[in-house]
Amino acid sequence: SFKVDTALIVAEERLQLADRLGEEYVNQGLMNLADALNKIGKHENALNVLDRVKRTGAVRKDTYFYYLYHTTYLSCYNDETEASRKRLFMRQIKAYKDTLIAISDPNTASYVTNQCGRLGLQGKWDEAIRILTGYYEHCTDTNPDKARVEYLLAELYLGKRDIQQAKHFLIRASITDIANAKKVYMSLQQLAILLFQEGDIARAYNYISCSLEDVSFGKARYRIIDIAEYLPIIKAANDSRIKADR
């Protein structure tokens, strides 16, 4: 199980120890701290911490460093409502996606997922799906990136309005998460929304409730905003369904 608040405490303690061990340990500690801050919803704080990382040769080649900038700006984009700031954040997302593609080995999940993500942003759904499917066919059950690849395939199919294929890969990603004992359930949450839109209220409510329990357990406040929009609507629909069945 994973608790974000615990991760923040550990990151802060590791950073204190890193001061005695040298620059690269400090840089790694700052990255861990930024990751934890982003996950508790303190995105601007996370960016400030990342800006403190010294751009050593090792850091400039570290995909984790650029991944953190990418995901933090993505969090900023998702939380923002003002159009001009959303455009600013999207420019940063695209820039860091390009950087990740440039420094990643072409045979890695980092390269392939960011390449396909960029194609998706350009509306090139079929090309992105073709490339990612090719990579996915070689993913074993022990591949730690398997669920992430399945989730991205679902997003790409959603982009081209193929709801059935999107549901297929969301189900697969959910199963992979459960098999790997990962209390993430982002795929389950998205699946709940699709099922609700199709009128399958009971399953939608069960799945989004499971996602909410995960967020509450892990104290992952960065994900509450993802659930908050649909949870009241799905709950109200489920309450109406139960009353109608009585």
Language model region names:
Residues 1-243:
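A "functional boundary" signal
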